Amino acid sequence: MNLLIKGGRVIDPSQGIDEVLDILVENGAIKELGKGLAAPAGAGVVDAAGLIVTPGLIDMHVHLRDPGLEYKEDIVTGTRAAAAGGFTSVACMPNTKPVNDNKAVTSYIVAKAKAEGLVNVFPVGSITQGSKGDALAEMGDLKEAGCVAVSDDGRPVTSSELMRRALEYAKGMGIMVISHAEDLSLVGEGVMNEGFVSTELGLKGIPWAAEDAATARDVYLAEFTNSPLHIAHVSTMGSLRIIRNAKARGVKVTCETAPHYFSLTDDAVRGYNTNAKMNPPLRTADDLAAVKEALKDGTIDAIATDHAPHHLDEKDVEFNVALNGIIGLETSLPLSLKLVEEGVLTLPALVEKMACNPAAILGIDRGTLRQGAVADITVIDPAAVWTVEAGALASKSKNSPFLGWEMKGAAAYTIVGGTVVHSRG
């Protein structure tokens, strides 16, 4: 089907565009951008007056739990949640059951996503076999089967020597390494950020040094091997300082943060709220301010949700034993738009961090509205006001710390390959 998107504020940092334009889509690709374009016979029309039109948003860090953990989420429900949140593409982490450390699992994900998914799914393979940190996975096979990056996300690669070899091998393969930066010996039995709140609640803490030390190690290894490195879910002031300094030295390091790290602090854990339990943990107000500053100055390249669904039975337990992680696909856009309202980011800068930069980091042919590009488009209603309600969420799991929050901003239309896969009705 052909489509004309009329009269929206088109923001495409890849072309330096920020103006009211029409977009004509033909055969799943961008045919033309211009003013006063006419709809061809039989074309659908999207009235985007008063709305913002951007390259399709990309979440480069999600857990779809498929295969093996479909009671939490699966490719169908996960991509439905992505579409509802305005995402046209997601990159799914390998901590499935079995772990995505081989061609067969990757091929399953690619095939199921193509057959049943609403949005593009780009698999991330495991750095090590079984994500056990003992031996490297076959990165060449993973890339050939469709993986766009490798990560042991959920666990760090403990061995520095193995991480060095991973960076060297991945560089040769032309595939990005995504680091889960965490020193487990410093984490110990910690379950939340170490500080005043953990002491008050009587919970064992995770020091900021656990993230900072691991970030420093991986940055130095990237510098030593002259290899690209992406650091996931950055949450501390110290890690951001390390990354900022590394970038200034010319190290090929990029990083992401998640909306919860610029929207919540460890105060959210009060009341032993297991929906505020994730890894890395929510940090202090000083860390939150540092995350916003790093978004503003470009130290942080991308915003990614770390969407981590869990069954109610895995969260409705004592805080110490509750699993880490929260869902985020459907709340990311309004929480991120708040950064624009607060003056932390301009709208074009936000689009860069949610579309253009993730595409560039992962090396995927998305994140642009250039003529001839795949017509992955997000149409945003910045004025939409809505309340986060468990029953209205598309995700199979409901483990969100934002339940009951009033949000401003939503995806009016999510368009994948020229097809409207979500419209806000």
Swiss-Prot record:
EC number(s) given by UniProt: 3.5.2.3
Gene3D superfamilies: Metal-dependent hydrolases (3.20.20.140), Urease, subunit C, domain 1 (2.30.40.10)
Molecular functions (GO terms): allantoinase activity; dihydroorotase activity; zinc ion binding
GO BP annotations listed: 'de novo' UMP biosynthetic process; purine nucleobase catabolic process
Assigned protein family: Belongs to the metallo-dependent hydrolases superfamily. DHOase family. Class I DHOase subfamily.
Organism: Geobacter sulfurreducens (strain ATCC 51573 / DSM 12127 / PCA)
Keyword annotations: Hydrolase, Metal-binding, Pyrimidine biosynthesis, Zinc
Protein name: Dihydroorotase
